[in-house]
Structure formats: C-alpha cells, structure tokens
Curated annotation (Swiss-Prot):
Residues 445-461 have a biased composition (Basic and acidic residues). It comes from the Eukaryota. It is a multi-pass membrane protein. This is Bestrophin homolog 17. The chain crosses the membrane at residues 28-48, 96-116, 231-251, 275-295. It comes from Caenorhabditis elegans. The lineage of its organism: Eukaryota, Metazoa, Ecdysozoa, Nematoda, Chromadorea. Residues 462-474 have a biased composition (Polar residues). Residues 49-95, 252-274 are extracellular. It is found in: Cell membrane. Keywords: Cell membrane, Chloride, Chloride channel, Ion channel, Ion transport, Membrane, Transmembrane, Transmembrane helix, Transport. GO terms for molecular function: chloride channel activity. Coiled coil: none annotated.
Length: 481
C-alpha cells in the first residue's frame, strides 16, 4: 500500500516533522535497519579480532592498511553516481505515474455519446467499460506481481466477473496464434462501438470518432507501461552504482576502525561505536534504497503503485457512470450564488482565506488627490538599454573612430569639430535642442553642405566639383609640365 504522509507535512510545525520521522512503513529506518545490522556485525567482528586476536605485527599491518584505505576513500564518487542515478530513476517513475490510466475519460465519453435508454444501449456501454478494464488486467498481470498474485490464471479473471467463459475460450484461441493478447479486449470494445454507430445508437461520425479516440488513449497509456517494464534502465548502470556503494562500506569496515597503537596514526578518541560512519551509512544506503524502490513502481514495496485498487476503482466508477447514474441530473433551480449579497461561507474552525494580490498592489506612491506632472518622453532621446549601449550606438562609434583616423592621415581639420555634427549620423541621433538651425540628413543639399566634407575615404569641397586630392594631383602635374 502506498504510504500517505501529506497530512504530516501540512505545515512547518517542528512536531509534525518529528511525526514524519516516526513513520515506519516505507521509511528509511525500515529500508536500512537490516543492512545496518549486518554491517555492524562485520564491523565488531573485525574490531575484536584487531584488538584481542591479532599479534603486534598483524596489528601494525592492519593499521597500515586502514590508514591507506581511509586516505583513498575519496576515489569513489558516491555522491556523483547516486545523484545522477536517483534523478534518472525518479524521472522514469514520474513518467509511469503520469501515464497510469483511469477509466473516467472513457466512461464519460461513452455515456454522453451513446445516450440511449434501451437495454441494448445500456449493455453496450457496460460491455465497452468491462472490456477496457479487462485489457488493463491482462497488461497488469504481466508487469505487476500484485495483480499476478490476485489473478494467477485467467480462470480467476472469469471468476471475478471481468470476463465470461465464452470470452475466455475466444481469448485462448487467439493466444495460440499470438503470444500476446492484450489487444483483444480493445478490439472487442471498438467492434461494439462500430456496431452501435451502424445501428445509429451513436448518431454522428464525430461522436463515434471521439469514443474510439478515448479507448485509444487508454490503450496507449497501457502500452507505455508495457514499454516501461520491458525496457528498463541498462543493467550495467544500477550494477555499478549498487556495487560502488557496497564496496565503499565494505572498505569502511577496515578504514573506519579506531587505531590503538603508539604510532602517529593513533586516533585521538577510542569510541566503541563509529557514530559518524553509522550516520553516513544510514544516509547513503537510504539514498540508494530510494533508487531501488523507484526502479520498479509496479512491484511489491510499501511505496509501489496500488494497481489492484486502480482496477477495482476503474470497474466500479466506470459502471456507475455508464449505467447507475447515466442520464440523471438534479432539477434546475436557482442557486445561492445568484444572490448579489452572497458572501463566502466557512466553518468556524477553518482558516480565513487570503486573496491573490500582487506584491506591489498595496504600495501607494501618490494620494488620489495629488497632482502628478506628466512628462512627454521622446523615445529617440532615451538612453541606451545597457551600459555598453545599443548595437547601433557601438557601430556608429566604430565609424566615427575610422573617420578620425582618416582625417588624421590627411592632416585635415575634423569637420565634426567645425560643424558640430557629423553628416554620417542619421537625423534621429542629432541633438536638435542645441543645434536648432542645423539641417538634418533629409534636408542637406548643396547650399547647406560644408566647405569640405567626407564621402567615403575622399574629402570633397563645395567650391568645386573636384576633390582636394584631385586638385593636388593636377597641380603636381602642371608643375612637372
């Protein structure tokens, strides 16, 4: 039976924590006590042999071995291996829990989409639910020992009422042709739904598709559990983890002994009980036991899934939905919530609820009567979004740096210093407040151009169509001429 302890941790009261530690079923104490008892037997056997049976020479050799192994215990990365292993096993355990199928979705779909009140309608609904649960039983018999013990043979399934004798005969005849017959009850349920659709018990094709889809989802969930059981974690992984943990504490039988010689290796305290090693044993072995339990959640441990209870609940709830309570609903009357003066009701001992409010909802930065000045902000004047500036700002700074290098190489005065702005910058980057009369890029024309400016890597002059480099080259040609 799954151990429920949610009530014990319903609050942070320290006494509730003590109640949680006091649990026995499924607890760390129950998992570790047997291993700890065996380990202590071996520990004290070596303890008495070392102190009372060994000679001085053997004691010296034993102490050297103890010191050597104790210094190298860190070579076994137990925390690393157990951490990854438990995480992997827990993810598989959670996946198996999430796909565990319940009958409600199938039963509600069948009850709504096959709404007839006749005897054939009623028997069809009940048979579909029974076949779906029978499919679940056949799967659980092969992957769960608890269900296998409940139904050792298919004859027990017939005696429990989940299957009739003639249905068992058909199932056994199919079993001679196929090794697995999980699909047979699902095929029966689909065939019943098809016949109901052909006889107009299920009117619309979309309704028929919805019934088939609900049955399919149940079958897919059971197929996932079959894969979970048939394809486990590669066996080498749990082997190396379980072996490493047990080898570690086997070495501790020697390395954690209290030494009594006069050597420098003599321990400062001589305790008869290795308290710290026992605590380490409880925590590490308990951690490993968690992984062992989670490896097969369909087993027979205290914390494994209650699959027999799931089967019983599925058949009882499914039949209640499609038959016992089918088509019934209470009379329509006005409810108390329609009263505008209605207030939520709580028992006298219950806790008053707290509404969900934002963390800054009750912060008052201004009174309702305060006059708050609204300032219009131009997005173009906003500072960069980070200390390093935007990508455009960094790219523009890089182009300005290249321009300064080009100006210095030509020994010319920087036009940006002369005109107070740079023609390569877009209009949005210009400071319009300090340069109201300066033209922007959109309004720059020949009459507004500076006396000399850059276009690419050449300096042009507005006085003539030739660049200064071209004029200087022509002058040198005239002189040579």
């Amino acid at each position: 039976m799954t151990v429920s302890y949610q009530l014990d941790v319903s609050s942070g009261n320290p006494l509730l924590f003590l109640r949680l530690l006091g649990r026995w079923r499924g607890s760390i104490w129950k998992s570790v006590v047997g291993d700890l008892f065996v380990w202590l037997l071996f520990y004290y056997a070596i303890y008495f042999a070392y102190r009372y049976a060994f000679s001085k020479q053997l004691q010296t050799v034993f102490e050297e071995i103890s010191i050597h192994t104790d210094d190298r215990m860190k070579y076994l990365p137990l925390t690393f291996m157990l951490g990854f292993f438990v995480t992997t096993v827990f993810e598989r355990w959670r996946s198996a829990l999430n796909v565990m199928p319940f009958i409600e979705s199938v039963a509600l779909s069948v009850a709504v989409l096959l709404p007839g009140k006749g005897r054939e309608d009623r028997l069809t609904r009940r048979a579909i639910i029974r076949y779906v649960v029978l499919h679940q039983i056949l799967v659980f018999r092969d992957i769960s020992m608890r269900v296998r013990r409940r139904f050792p043979t298919l004859k027990y399934v017939v005696d429990a009422g989940f299957m009739r004798q003639e249905e068992l005969d058909v199932l056994e005849s199919v079993n001679q042709e196929s090794s697995q017959t999980y699909w047979v009850p699902i095929n029966w349920a689909n065939s019943l739904a098809l016949v109901a659709h052909q006889q107009k018990l299920i009117d619309q094709p979309t309704a028929f598709n919805n019934v088939i889809f609900a049955i399919k989802e149940f079958r897919v969930a059971m197929e996932t559990l079959i894969k979970f059981d048939a394809i486990p974690i590669p066996i080498a992984y749990p082997q190396v983890v379980f072996l490493a943990v047990r080898v570690y504490f086997a070495i501790c039988l020697v390395s954690r002994q209290f030494l009594i010689s006069d050597m420098k290796s003599k321990t400062q305290m001589d305790w008869p009980v290795p308290i710290m090693t026992v605590l380490e044993f409880i925590f590490v072995i308990g951690w490993m036991k968690v992984a062992e339990v989670l490896l097969n959640p369909l087993g027979e441990d205290d914390d494994d899934f209650e699959v027999n209870s799931i089967i019983d609940n599925n058949i009882s709830r499914g039949m209640a939905i499609v038959d016992t309570t089918h088509g019934y609903h209470p009379d329509l009357v006005d409810d108390v919530f329609s009263d505008p003066n209605y207030l939520p009701a709580y028992s006298e001992n219950s806790q008053i609820p707290r509404n969900l409010t934002g963390s800054a909802a009750k912060v008052e930065l201004a009174a309702p009567t305060d006059e708050v000045k609204i300032v219009r902000v131009n997005p173009e004047d906003a500072p960069p979004t980070s200390e390093r500036g935007s990508m455009f700002t960094r790219r523009n700074a890089y182009s300005l740096r290249n321009r300064k290098i080009s100006i210095a190489s030509n020994n010319l005065e920087s036009p940006s210093q002369e005109r107070k702005f740079n023609l390569s910058m877009p209009a949005g980057m210009l400071n319009k407040s300090t340069q109201p009369d300066r033209p922007t890029m959109e309004t720059v024309s020949e009459e507004h151009e500076p006396s000399h400016f850059y276009r690419g890597d050449r300096v042009h002059s507005s006085d003539s169509g030739l660049s200064k480099t071209q004029q200087s080259s022509e002058e040198s040609v005239d002189k040579k001429g």
